[in-house]
């Protein structure tokens, strides 16, 4: 577990949560363009991020409403949790 995360680790978490190949993940992926990104997948993303960030993600309210890779990255950058 870590106190910060790399973009490629975010991509890997999202790919696994959406059950799609990691090579398909980029900053434009969102719930608007991937039907796989439903509420259950979003919850799985949040749980995996929280585990990777040693419990820090659960304290970031904005993540619960971040339904895109770009938004997740922006929030983690703002909170200084992105390497």
PLM region descriptions:
Residues 2-47, 51-83:
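Phosphopantetheine-dependent thiolation modules in NRPS/PKS and related acyl-activating systems
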